[in-house]
Regions:
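Gly/Pro-rich interdomain helix-loop hinge
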Residues: 289-356
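Short, amphipathic C-terminal "tail helix"
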Residues: 354-390
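Glycine-rich phosphate/diphosphate-binding loops that line cofactor/substrate pockets in enzymes
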Residues: 40-55, 73-78, 106
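Oxyanion-binding "anion nests"
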Residues: 235-285
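N-terminal amphipathic/basic leader segments beginning at the initiator methionine
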Residues: 1-49
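N-terminal small/polar loop signature for handling phosphorylated ligands or for N-terminal nucleophile
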Residues: 63-135, 249-260
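A glycine/threonine-rich phosphate-anchoring loop and its flanking beta-alpha core
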Residues: 40, 132-228, 315, 319-322
Length: 390
C-alpha cells in the first residue's frame, strides 16, 4: 500500500529520501465485538459497563425485523431493565434528541444503547450530550465541548454504512438551516460496538445500496484527505478491500452472510478511518443536496464521488491508483457500483434543478469537510463538480 511517506521522484527519475510520516494523535475509542449472533451479548456488555437501566434508542422501522425486541430480550436476560425510545427519524434534528432526553430523564437511565443505522447512532449520542451536559446541540458543535461526564454507551449498527459506531461525533440536523451540525467529544463515543452481520440480513436492497455506497465513499475520501496518516490509511485501505468486492455480491445475493460480514466490517473500518483522519469535498457537496431535495445521503455521495475523484487526481492520483489502478479506474468503478445497485448516477436523475447549483455550491463551500480535501477547493470548483455531476 502506498502511503503518505512514499519515496518522491527527482527530475532525474531517481527516488529521493522518503518524506517522514505526518504526525498524528489517535486514541482508539473502544472495544469491538464482531461475529454472527453477537447482538445476544448486548445485555452482558451493558452489565459489564455498570448499566442497570438501559435506554435503547432505535427507529420504529426496525420492529418488523425484530431487532429491538431481541435487544430488549438480551438486556433483560442480563438482569437489567430496558426502556425503548423509538422516536428516531432519518437525519435526526434537535427535536428528536430533545424528545429522547425527556424520555431518558423520565426513566432515570444510566446507560445508552443504540440499535439501528446512523440516525439511531447520532440521536443516541445527541441524547447523551444533552442529558448529561444540558444546553442545546449547537453548544457542542465542533469537538470537546462537554464539561461533565457522559453516560457509557453501546452501539449496534443494523446497516453497513455510516460507521457511526466507530466515531465520536453526532451529526444532528439544524432545523433552521437544514445543515448538519457535527458535535464531537471522546466521551460521546460508544464504549463498545457490537457488530452482528446477521442483523444486516434484513436490510432492504435500497438500504443496503445507499449505506454501502456511503461506506465506500468514507473509505475513499478518508484515504486521501488532507489529514490522512499511516494509521488512518491502514483502516481506509482495509475498508475498501472489504467493501469493493462485496458490494455487488450483496446486491445480487442479499442472504450471503460472508458478503454481509465483509460489508459490516468494512463500514466499521471506514468509520475508524474517519475518526483518525477526516473526509473531503464529496461529503460537503452531499449535505446541501439532502437539505434542499431530500436526496438520500448515500445517493448524494455516490453521484458526487466519481467527479471528486477525477478532480483530486492531480493531487493524489497515486493514492487512488493504490485502490483501483488509477483515478479514472476508481471513478469508473464507483459508477459501475451505482449502476449495479440501480441508483441514480446524475443530479438530474435525482430531481435537482440546474438553476440551484450556484446556491448548492455556496452552501457546500461552508461545510467543514471541504477544508480537508486533498486538493484545495473553492466555491467555483465546487460549482464545477456539481455541473459535472448534473
Amino acid at each position: 500500500m502506498k502511503g503518505t511517506c512514499s519515496p518522491t521522484s527527482t527530475s532525474s527519475g531517481r527516488s529521493s529520501t522518503p518524506a517522514p510520516p505526518p504526525a498524528f494523535d489517535f486514541q482508539p475509542l473502544g472495544r469491538v465485538v464482531f461475529g454472527s449472533g453477537s447482538l445476544a451479548r448486548l445485555g452482558e456488555v451493558a452489565r459489564e459497563l455498570g448499566g442497570t437501566r438501559v435506554l435503547l434508542v432505535t427507529d420504529p422501522g426496525l420492529e418488523a425485523a425484530g431487532h429491538p425486541q431481541r435487544a430488549v430480550a438480551a438486556i433483560e436476560e442480563a438482569g437489567l431493565e430496558a426502556f425503548v425510545f423509538d422516536g428516531v427519524k432519518e437525519n435526526p434534528t434537535e427535536r428528536e434528541v430533545a424528545a429522547g432526553v425527556v424520555f431518558a430523564r423520565t426513566h432515570r437511565v444510566d446507560l445508552i444503547a443504540a440499535v439501528g443505522g446512523g440516525s439511531s447512532m447520532d440521536c443516541a449520542k445527541g441524547v447523551n450530550f444533552l442529558l448529561t451536559n444540558g444546553g442545546r446541540m449547537a453548544d457542542y458543535k465542533g469537538h470537546g465541548k462537554a464539561t461533565k461526564p457522559m453516560l457509557p454507551s453501546v452501539g449496534v449498527p443494523t446497516t453497513s454504512g455510516t460507521g457511526s459506531e466507530a466515531q465520536s461525533y453526532a451529526l444532528i440536523t439544524d432545523e433552521r438551516s437544514h445543515l448538519k451540525m457535527a458535535c464531537g467529544d471522546k466521551q460521546a463515543a460508544f464504549r463498545v460496538s457490537i457488530l452482528d452481520p446477521e442483523v444486516t440480513l434484513s436490510q432492504p436492497k435500497l438500504v443496503s445500496a445507499v449505506t454501502g455506497i456511503d461506506a465506500v465513499a468514507h473509505a475513499v475520501e478518508s484515504f486521501v484527505c488532507a489529514r490522512r496518516n499511516p494509521l488512518s490509511q491502514t483502516y481506509s485501505h482495509a475498508a475498501f478491500r472489504q467493501l469493493e468486492p462485496n458490494f455487488e455480491r450483496v446486491m445480487s445475493h442479499p442472504t450471503d452472510l460472508a458478503a454481509r460480514s465483509a460489508m459490516l466490517l468494512g463500514a466499521h473500518f471506514a468509520g475508524m478511518a474517519i475518526e483518525a483522519a477526516m473526509l473531503g469535498v464529496c461529503h460537503s457537496c452531499a449535505n446541501p443536496l439532502t437539505a434542499h431535495y431530500g436526496v438520500t445521503h448515500g445517493v448524494a455521495v455516490g453521484v458526487m464521488l466519481p467527479h471528486v475523484v477525477r478532480f483530486n487526481a492531480a493531487a493524489v492520483g497515486d493514492l487512488y491508483a493504490d485502490l483501483a489502478g488509477s483515478a479514472g479506474a476508481l471513478a469508473d468503478r464507483v459508477t459501475a457500483m451505482l449502476s449495479a445497485a440501480g441508483l441514480p448516477r446524475t443530479l438530474k436523475e435525482c430531481g435537482v434543478s440546474e438553476s440551484i447549483l450556484p446556491l448548492l455550491a455556496e452552501e457546500a463551500n461552508q461545510q467543514w469537510t471541504a477544508r480537508f480535501n486533498p486538493r484545495e477547493v473553492s466555491e467555483a470548483d465546487i460549482l464545477g463538480l456539481y455541473r459535472a455531476a448534473w
